[in-house]
């Protein structure tokens, strides 16, 4: 299964790359996963979408088209998101909105971080967003309150849930 780990924050000093590296290291131990890390801070997606976009057959700006095959080729996603002001970052919503077919029917899981809530309020708000795109939110989110890295078993449960959904979808 090809897994894309998406770092959703572009803020300087963010914890997202640390959380993504933790998950990536655990995912790479498995022989059932090919893993890509997509850092939205390096994607440089435009923040203004044209009216009616995304529409089938319409080409987006170069940065959007550069990222498209990475998302299209992924079988599953892990969104690494902070909680900012009880929600997820605008950079993540922007990235989600540029694409549609790339999310459809694919499992999405979450690694969230923040203060006391551990980012869970951000995840709560992401569920209906991905639901509207016909993606399937799976597994319990991995929560990192106060930026504390959890036991490896948390990553294993998350990856197992994604792999199971992917396997069931193939049948």
PLM-predicted stretches and their roles:
Residues 85-86, 117:
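Glycine-rich nucleotide phosphate-binding loop and flanking beta-alpha elements
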């Amino acid at each position: 299964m090809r897994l894309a780990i998406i770092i959703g924050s572009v803020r300087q000093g963010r914890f997202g790359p640390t959380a993504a590296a933790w998950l990536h290291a655990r995912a790479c131990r498995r022989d059932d996963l090919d893993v890509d890390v997509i850092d939205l801070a390096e994607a440089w997606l435009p923040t203004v979408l044209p009216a009616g976009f995304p529409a089938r057959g319409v080409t987006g700006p170069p940065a959007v088209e550069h990222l498209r095959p990475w998302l299209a080729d992924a079988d599953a996603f892990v969104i690494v998101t902070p909680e900012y002001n009880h929600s997820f970052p605008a950079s993540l919503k922007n990235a989600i909105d540029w694409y549609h077919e790339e999310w459809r029917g694919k499992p999405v899981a979450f690694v969230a971080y923040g203060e006391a809530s551990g980012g869970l309020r951000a995840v709560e708000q992401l569920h209906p967003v991905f639901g509207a795109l016909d993606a399937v939110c799976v597994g319990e989110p991995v929560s990192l309150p106060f930026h504390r890295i959890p036991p490896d078993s948390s990553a294993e449960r998350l990856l197992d849930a994604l792999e199971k959904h992917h396997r069931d979808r193939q049948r």
